[in-house]
Amino acid sequence: MRKILILFTVLFVSNFYAQDILPLKERAKFVNKLQKERFNNLLPELMEKTGIDMWVLIAREYNEDPIIKTMLPPTWLNARRTTIIVFSLDSETKNFESVAIARYAFGDNIPSIWNKEKQPNQWKALKDYIVSKNPEKIGINTSSYESLADGLSKYHYDQLYNVLSPKFRKKIVSAEDLAIAWIETRTDLEMTAYSQLVEISSAIIREAFSTKVITPGVTTTDDVVWWMREKVIELGLDTWFHPTVDVQRKDESDLYAFDNNSKFDTILPGDLLHCDFGISYLTLNTDTQELGYVLKPEETSAPDFLVNALKDGN
């Protein structure tokens, strides 16, 4: 009998999926709560730590700054028109304020303060707000090294620069450290959710590496990749990056795991399977690599050394 040994518990996890993946409306409520905590509790700490007392983020609809994309309200799929949000932290009183200088409030968490009747020009309204706060530094998303911190377009930079007086132009600095800190720091609530993402990712891998999906001698690694993509869509999730599934065997095929031919390798008994897989859910992403072994016809279990290795590796 051709069998695949998965060196973690093989479960068909339809009940797991059904019970633990939230409907879209419930996801939106959770993300809104998550973002509120990040804006009100985490961001002031990061601004103080990185020495930025004002952070100006600007994006155009369908051309979003990568940082703004992480802040979008759950009911927004894109920025709207020209979206400007400003975070300010008083260095003395530690009062924190987040505002939108835009046509609309930025979801439930950031109100719009732009009075178009009083000041119809959006950029002048931004200038007026900056002047009222008189920050020591005006952080913007420009960076020579970090792509995620380099989301401000040349046009928007010019608009900001030109509307400010020389006094405030001198205060413009890169918010690179703050942007990266925002991206890399997770709250306790996010870590609770993240453990669920990891479980979902591993459950998909368990199913992908089972006889439900793989028939040794017939199924190719590329077949498994596309099954994983389809499974993610079926669950109402997103794939963070195109998965990789490759085989490692004595013929050194593992040396060519990322070339154009190896993705069509037929999975055989005795193969060590490797995958690199990630999903996106609740504004978080996973990047998971796990291994599995395909039993040879005469085997009832994997070699002991492999069992021990995969216990550590998986």
PLM segments and residue spans:
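Active-site neighborhoods and metal-handling regions in enzymes and metal-associated proteins
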Residues: Q19-N314
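Bacterial Sec-dependent N-terminal signal peptides
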Residues: M1-Q19
